[in-house]
């Protein structure tokens, strides 16, 4: 979808993630890229089966505003938000994050 600029009516990556994870059936790791802005987004992606997430815009915002220290601060914020979310859900490690922690509507188009 490339930031919603080219096809703003396409499904969000997080909406397509469960379908992709089911389709590959564990044969390859699935990475989610697109729409990740907060630590809660990272948590949701991991809970829905992503092995990793790509984060672009928040780092670019930090870089544009404050240079390298801005990028480092964005990373600190995302880590803090993820840790807070994990704590609120009772998960101690990333491996503890499962689908049970998110409710998804019927995202079928």
List PLM regions with ranges.
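Glycine-rich, proline-tolerant flexible connector loops at the mouths of alpha/beta enzymes
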Residues: 1-11, 60-63
